[in-house]
Amino acid sequence: MMELSRSLVVEEAESYRESEPLVTVEDQHLDILPGMFADGEFGHRDAEWVVRWYFRRFLGRYPDAERRRREEQFRENDFDRVHTLLGELAGMDVDEALDRLTALDGVDVPVATAFLQFADPDSYLVVGEREWSVLHEAGELSEPSPDPLSPAAYETYLSRCRALADEFDCDLVTLYRALWRLSTPDE
């Protein structure tokens, strides 16, 4: 069983910074999107970027047809509805945010958590099977990744991640990046 530690998280997050090709643009969006969403100063492409990032971070390991289908579904949403929702995220609790985000076409709980991460990276982090599986294998989550991922499961994951970030004295983005690297399939 893998054991998570502060040193492992820091090391793997640094590996992420050195090796993940999307890290620069991801950093830029983590820096600018929270304010843009909160202020309502964003366009459709800014919102669409989050959906594209969720799938494209797999670097071709996510089925292309499914990725394209989900991206197209998201593009079909009424932008005024998306704009209003993203502008109101900061005032919502996690249940309401997930409920409203998953009501959008092309957005399931994992994609909704990407929106939460980019709206408030100090409070939320994205989840998918890969990240969840690392925590399960390390004994930090008792159950394997549910399929489909429910809002209640995300809250369990988020609570555990917040506790680990506190324990390891790191932010949630650092923890996410470590989990992603620890779940990277062998090349």
Show the residue positions of the predicted features.
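Homeobox/homeodomain signature
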Residues: G40, G91-A97, L116-Q117, A165, ...
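Catalytic DNA-binding helix-loop module of base-excision-repair DNA glycosylases/AP lyases
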Residues: E96-E137
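Generic alpha-helix detector with strongest preference for long hydrophobic helices that associate
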Residues: D31, V82, E96, V111-L116, ...
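C-terminal accessory module of base-excision DNA glycosylases/AP lyases that mediates lesion recognition
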Residues: M1-R57, Y124-E187
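Helix-hairpin-helix/helix-loop-helix acidic hairpins
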Residues: L59-V107
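A short glycine-/small-residue-rich loop at the edge of a beta-strand within enzyme catalytic domains
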Residues: E88, M92, D122, A152
